[in-house]
Amino acid sequence: MVVPDKSLEEFRTFTATQNYKIIQNSSVVQAVKLNQQYAIVFYHPGTIDLGEGLTLATDKQVIVYLEQKGTGYDIWVADPLYSQREVCLALNGREVQIAFPEGELTGSTAFTNIATLQPFDLQCEYLSNPLGVDILQPRLSWKMGATTSARGRKQTAYQILVASSRDLLDADRGDLWDSGRVNSAESVNIVYGGVPLSAGQRCFWKVRFSDEHNRWSAWSNPANWRMGLFAADWAAQWIGSAEMESQSVGGKKVNNVMADPWFRKTFKMSDIPQDAVIYVASIGYHELYVNGRKVGDAVLSPSVTDHKSRARYMTYDIKGYLKTGTNVIALWLGTSWAVFPAYQQKNRPAIPMALVQAEIALSSGKKLRIVSDNTWKTHASPNTLLGYWEAHHFEGECYDAALEKDGWNTPDFDDSGWAMAKVYSTDVIVSSDRTEPNRLLGEIKPLSVQEVSPGVYRVDMGINYAGWFEMQLQGQPGDSIVFQFSERERMLAAMVYICIYKFGLQRKGVFCNRFNYMTGRWVQITGLRYKPELDQIRGWMIRPDYRRSGGFECDLPLLNDIYRTTLWTFEISVWVTMWSIVLIVNVVDTGEMHWPL
């Protein structure tokens, strides 16, 4: 079909000869309809109501041909400007990006399809495409999506396909499970009913549903999950450093002096990996590095649990981090919850520990397993917990730049002077960390820096928040910079949140929290030889990466402010890796009781 785009008169003549129904005819958009076919010329970005509950929007000048096909719409798009690279269309709010073929400058066209009925937001155990599912029969969920709204729309049946490969799934073959037609309106926590699954197995799945008129929807976009390890699958051993903390002297608590430890293990690969996954459990927080690169963007992992009886493991896909030749897996452990008094075991020292197992499948067909044991190397890092991780004594971190060792997590680093890791025994239950991780989800910029007394500066971050504080620093070797955090302007370090940065030989450095966090709005800084600039400072609000499922807005500003304040309070107060009630204490988990006060 060719739609003229030169003049209104040509458009009228065209529609008249073709017996089209004119929907709109203006200098902004022209649209006609014949049966279930639509032709639309957008002279400017905009939206048009095509009738029968159908709206179409575009962000560019474009020609669109729309035809209903079964439960979907075929869409052809032409570029009247001969130079556009892509266009974003939205059919009843469902957006699709359409890219024009590269290299074609005249009359370039593109095609896509938007289904009127299609499941979306597929989840396995409440997560999207999760890694490390340690449930033999995972539960699957989805939502019913429709581009055309109508009363009484509902699901009357569903069919789930689960395959061992994406190719099989694309061919509509569920070799692991084909549920067949199940007459049910249920779409939440449908228990997997296929062949038994094994540790580390990848599962690809999709679903479709039947509506109130017994019409099948389109298949959902594919989703996947990877199985985790079960108790019998672990071949690794718990490791830690030999350094012990003296938690009390003469029956009194003393501050921690044990550095957060580093661990590393080198190994060789003769071939590129076809698949590679690593499971890391830790008592205390951890950061994982492979060949010098931090794996993932999660922070303060894994989730908090009672280490008297349990430890959580994280699952990481490390295929893209490995190479042929020498590789290294490196860990940075945070003391944190490992020394929390209520989580201690009599048969386990109060030190951070890790349990690591990597499963690597090479392109040659060979399999490689790397496990934590006494062949790993360990060394103290520059980071040390301040306080002793108990109510009113969480304090902060001390980073001593003089103890840095560049490249400690790279393959070529000389670790001959490092100690061997020590193997420990503990009877904690190891289970997967099946929740959204903590992430840096909001950058906070300071409002002002004030010199409150000679050499003492107070930073106003503009809002009370829970998260990290980051600052670019300059100083002389041996200088110590002290940061004291407070929720109230005139109350210094009310909850004893104190961090320290010590300069080494380098005269520049960056302080940022790593295995602890702060709460507050005001930061008092001592030890600097200059007044800091605002662009040298920033904060990070940290929370679990949950998706917001709703919102609130009305025409009363007071109610909108109450909603925003309540939402912010919730976001900074309920974490999967810690409980933080600003103005109370880190470990309190009774936020709902305190928020109304």
Task: Set out the residue ranges of the language-model regions.
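Well-ordered alpha-helical segments within folded domains of soluble proteins
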Residues: 589-597
